[in-house]
């Protein structure tokens, strides 16, 4: 081999080596973007050596605290670095991350709602995080260590621990968590350590009774009641002080309850099995005798009374003066999970019977396919009035003007077709113009949706809507209820709706810049936040779509059609093709998280300029969510999704962050969608 050839070979080998090292070191683009976002959200701390707010190679350049496997980030260890700010909203993109330790910093805000589902170790302790434990924890099937102690977490824990068999340690101590322990704690068969001290938990700790490996429990300084299970009294460490435990002997567990004998060797010999079976049979027999005796006593009591065995007089259809049984004075008997009793009420001077579906399982006694009974102080009923109720009190409509039917007919040309602005599931909307130049939008409610037997229902609706005031809500001006016709009068917006700007073809309808779109999204989110978190009781909109987002002269959003959710139960029409969340097979299934999904679809419209459902497109692209969802996390295809009307005039980082917010809003599982307050905070960062 000649010298020239040798030189060429050496150069080739050197170049190949350099090329190979670069290829191997190149970090996955989604991982880079997620770390860039986290770095910016933490206020770009100089203490994190090598980190960058844009681009970079975390794996190849060995960013501080980052461990990789191949081109994927697998570990983040940045404990005790004095970090501030938040963690951003893209950590869920780190698909290979198994270890996350951000403890002992000054991080604040909500924890990312979507965390990597391959985490085995999660430590966010000793920070200033608020909000709640992210529901995405429920998807971490390999998680063994969870420590979010010594923060400012608040609210009730979601029932999300069903599928975490490898979880050995939970530390949620020194927060402001409330409510009862999730029943799914009983599924944590691998749990060894549980620290819940210094919170505001209440109820019993019976869910911990049969955990086979539990050896360290600290529930001190909460508001727990009931008895400490005997099964926990023999574990290695048990701290229970500062609660409201019951005194005296604890009641026996119900028949059939699984019992964990912590003093046995685990062999499970035949004698112990026989003893356990004997105990179960004995307890069951005694329970059966007691139940039988109770039934006899009840039958005897009923025979000695004049009351029927029904809640209502079957012949006259009137309520009985006495309830089926009388609980303590000033308490309410509530039936949960019993649709058949939905409208039945018995009234007594000391007690009331309310029947409604249960949102949370708070049952004290429950039977499969049967109602659940609770005793709740009746004062709670008055403390949380229902806006949709039709009480005997006269509705307050003093804040709005009562228009005559003649006035509205004159100003709307007798509701002629040329004054028709639109038609929805509830009724038609007309434009009304008064002689003094004032313009209003008049919404006539479909008469079939108003119960004829309750003439005051419309007045209650007016009273409810007139009490809602927010700068991003379309204001109710007045109403009309004459000759069987019921109308709501709103302020009129000459700019029309967001739907008009995004989806109509004329040039006038496409002036929305990217910054304007973000501002529209933020204003709408604030309006929804007002309904969900400020109104008392909270309201669900149930019909969020771009045609219900009106724009004023400065293109500020005004959410309309609020306060009418009760009507959506009475119509079989689709509330908005492409907007409905997957769980909403009918209008009654809507929740606040369904509103978040619908708003996510509106954000997709702002991002892409496409309709939520477009039958004119190829089949794979007709459903906006189905088409866009897989591409929202792909940096290479995201630019191709953006509305062509923007002509490329936007910051890629802003679009990427906007897409991340959209992706968690349109999650299929309702529990994985963020509360709208989280969405508001995320959008604020983009303005």
Curated annotation (Swiss-Prot):
Give residue spans on the Cytoplasmic membrane side: 300-687
Keyword annotations for this protein, in alphabetical order, are: ATP-binding, Glycoprotein, Leucine-rich repeat, Membrane, Nucleotide-binding, Receptor, Repeat, Signal, Transmembrane, Transmembrane helix
Q: What happens when the gene is disrupted?
A: Plants show a reduction in leaf size, but no apparent defect in pollen development or fertility.
From the UniProt entry, list the residue stretches annotated as the region Disordered: 239-269, 310-329, 344-365, 378-398
Q: Where is the signal peptide?
A: 1-25
Map the LRR repeats onto residue numbers. Answer: 96-118, 119-140, 142-165, 166-189, 190-212, 213-235
Which residues are on the Extracellular side of the membrane? 26-278
SUPFAM superfamilies on file: L domain-like, Protein kinase-like (PK-like)
Please name the InterPro entries in this protein's record: Kinase-like_dom_sf, Leu-rich_rpt, LRR_dom_sf, LRR_N_plant-typ, PRK1-6/SRF4-like, Prot_kinase_dom, Ser-Thr/Tyr_kinase_cat_dom
Q: Give the membrane topology, semicolon-separated if more than one.
A: Single-pass membrane protein
Tell me which tissues or organs this protein is expressed in.
Expressed in seedlings, roots, stems, leaves, flowers and siliques.
Q: Using the UniProt annotation, give the residues that carry a glycan (glycosylation sites).
A: 187, 263
Q: What else is known?
A: Cannot functionally replace STRUBBELIG.
Q: What is known of its domains?
A: The protein kinase domain is predicted to be catalytically inactive.
Name of the protein: Protein STRUBBELIG-RECEPTOR FAMILY 4
Organism equals Arabidopsis thaliana (Mouse-ear cress)
The gene behind this protein is SRF4
């Amino acid at each position: 081999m000649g010298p020239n050839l040798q030189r060429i070979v050496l150069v080739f080998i050197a170049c190949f080596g350099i090329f190979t090292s670069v290829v191997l070191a190149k970090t996955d683009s989604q991982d880079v973007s997620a770390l860039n976002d986290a770095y910016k959200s933490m206020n770009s701390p100089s203490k994190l050596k090598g980190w960058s707010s844009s681009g970079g190679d975390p794996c190849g350049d060995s960013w501080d605290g980052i461990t990789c496997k191949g081109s994927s980030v697998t570990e983040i260890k940045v404990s005790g670095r004095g970090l501030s700010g938040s963690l951003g909203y893209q950590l869920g993109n780190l698909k290979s991350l198994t270890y996350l330790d951000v403890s002992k910093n000054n991080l604040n805000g909500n924890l990312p709602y979507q965390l990597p589902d391959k985490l085995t170790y999660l430590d966010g302790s000793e920070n200033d995080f608020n909000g709640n434990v992210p529901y995405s924890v429920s998807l971490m099937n390999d998680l063994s260590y969870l420590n979010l102690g010594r923060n400012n977490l608040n609210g009730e824990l979601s029932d999300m621990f069903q599928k975490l068999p490898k979880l050995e340690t939970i530390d949620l101590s020194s927060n402001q968590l409330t409510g009862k322990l999730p029943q799914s704690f009983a599924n944590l068969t691998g749990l060894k350590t549980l620290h819940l001290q210094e919170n505001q938990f209440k109820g019993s700790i019976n869910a911990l009774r049969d955990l086979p490996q539990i050896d360290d429990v600290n529930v001190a300084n909460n508001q727990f009641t009931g008895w400490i299970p005997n099964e926990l009294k023999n574990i290695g460490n048990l701290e229970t002080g500062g609660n409201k435990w019951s005194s005296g002997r604890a009641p026996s567990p119900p028949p059939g309850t699984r019992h964990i004998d912590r003093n046995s060797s685990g062999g499970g010999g035949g004698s112990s099995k026989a003893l356990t079976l004997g105990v179960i049979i004995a307890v069951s027999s005694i329970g059966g005798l007691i139940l039988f005796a109770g039934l006899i006593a009840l039958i005897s009591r009923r025979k000695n009374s004049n009351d029927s065995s029904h809640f209502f007089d079957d012949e006259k259809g009137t309520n009985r003066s006495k309830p089926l049984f009388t609980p303590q004075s000033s308490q309410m008997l509530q039936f949960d999970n019993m649709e058949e009793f939905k409208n039945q009420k018995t009234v007594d001077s000391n007690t009331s019977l309310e029947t409604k579906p249960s949102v949370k399982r708070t049952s004290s006694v429950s039977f499969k396919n049967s109602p659940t009974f609770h005793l709740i102080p009746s004062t709670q009923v008055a403390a949380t009035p229902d806006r949709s109720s039709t009480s005997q009190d006269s509705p307050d409509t003093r804040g709005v003007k009562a228009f005559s039917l003649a006035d509205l007919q004159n100003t709307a040309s007798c509701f002629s077709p040329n004054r028709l602005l639109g038609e929805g599931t509830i009724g038609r909307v007309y434009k009304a113009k008064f002689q003094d130049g004032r313009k209003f939008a008049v919404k006539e409610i479909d008469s079939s949706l108003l119960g004829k037997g309750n003439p005051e229902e419309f007045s209650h609706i007016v009273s409810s809507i007139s009490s809602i005031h927010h700068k991003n809500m379309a204001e109710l001006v007045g109403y009309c209820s004459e000759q069987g016709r019921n109308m709501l009068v709103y302020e009129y917006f000459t700019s029309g709706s967001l739907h008009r700007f995004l989806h109509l073809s004329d040039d006038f309808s496409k002036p929305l810049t990217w910054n304007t779109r973000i501002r529209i999204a933020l204003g709408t989110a604030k309006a929804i936040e007002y309904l969900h978190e400020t109104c008392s009781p909270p309201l669900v909109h149930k019909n969020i779509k771009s045609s219900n987002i009106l724009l004023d002269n400065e293109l500020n959003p005004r959410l309309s059609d609020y306060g009418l959710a009760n009507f959506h139960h009475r119509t079989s029409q689709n509330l908005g093709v492409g907007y409905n969340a997957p769980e909403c097979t009918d209008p009654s299934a809507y929740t606040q998280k369904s509103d978040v999904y619908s708003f996510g679809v509106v954000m997709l419209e702002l991002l892409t300029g496409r309709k939520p459902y477009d039958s004119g497109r190829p089949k794979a692209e007709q459903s906006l969510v189905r088409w866009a969802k897989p591409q929202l996390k792909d940096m290479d295809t995201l630019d191709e999704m953006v509305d062509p009307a923007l002509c490329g005039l936007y910051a890629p980082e802003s679009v990427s962050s906007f897409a991340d917010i959209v992706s968690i809003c349109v999650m299929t599982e309702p529990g994985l969608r963020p509360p709208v307050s989280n969405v508001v905070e995320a959008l604020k960062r983009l303005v």
